[in-house]
């Protein structure tokens, strides 16, 4: 399970993209016909709502760089303005974005993204298109993104995840954000 991701600030509007060096392409390990890619490294994060952040060409260059898993509640200051059952830490909205290039040999394969846990009420976009909303916080979920990504070794794909933890949301400290591992799973169109 290894990954080599292509970091990117902002994508050029209509420029012809240059080929990405082979060693910088997203790579995966194969297990029984399934390629599992660690999708935790090289995300960008913004605490608070960001209008238009789901767009493919949104400029996230001033966002914080981080690796997942991540909890943005624990990074905030304790406050008496929230219920003590939440650990006296605020929730709120946070955005995550990741830019990646898929190698051409992934074209024609099924590609899904699996989240181990996001607390809570997450909305996921790929290349500006709504993939889905998952309102729960403690169970894993996955989306098939095959028809939304480009696998040509050149094109930058973007995944954006909006997380909204409206407190109170539990009777204990819940944290906020993509707090468990994320992986990409690549399979042949016919697989077990």
Please give the residue ranges for each predicted region.
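C-terminal segment of classical bacterial N-terminal signal peptides
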Residues: 2-11
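Accessory carbohydrate-binding/adhesion or oligomerization-edge regions at the termini
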Residues: 12-80, 158-164, 178, 184
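N-terminal accessory segment at the very beginning of proteins
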Residues: 16, 75-86, 96-98, 103
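Short, solvent-exposed beta-strand/turn "edge" segments of beta-rich domains on protein surfaces
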Residues: 32-34, 86-91
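Accessory beta-strand-rich segments of carbohydrate-active enzymes
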Residues: 37, 47-49, 91-192
């Amino acid at each position: 399970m290894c990954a080599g991701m292509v970091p990117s600030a902002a994508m050029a509007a209509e420029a012809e993209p240059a080929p990405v060096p082979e060693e910088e392409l997203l790579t995966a390990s194969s297990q029984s016909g399934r390629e599992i890619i660690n999708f935790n490294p090289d995300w960008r994060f913004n605490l608070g709502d960001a209008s238009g952040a789901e767009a493919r060409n949104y400029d996230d260059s001033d966002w914080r760089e981080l690796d997942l898993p991540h909890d943005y509640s624990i990074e905030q200051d304790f406050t008496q303005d929230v219920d003590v059952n939440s650990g006296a830490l605020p929730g709120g909205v946070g955005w995550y974005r990741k830019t990646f290039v898929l190698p051409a040999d992934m074209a024609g394969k099924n590609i899904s993204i699996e989240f181990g846990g996001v607390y809570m009420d997450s909305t996921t976009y790929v290349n500006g298109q709504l993939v889905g909303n998952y309102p729960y916080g403690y169970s894993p979920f996955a989306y098939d993104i095959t028809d939304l990504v480009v696998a040509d070794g050149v094109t930058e794909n973007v995944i954006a995840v909006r997380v909204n933890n409206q407190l109170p949301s539990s009777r204990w400290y819940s944290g906020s954000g993509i707090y468990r591992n994320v992986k990409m799973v690549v399979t042949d169109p016919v697989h077990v």
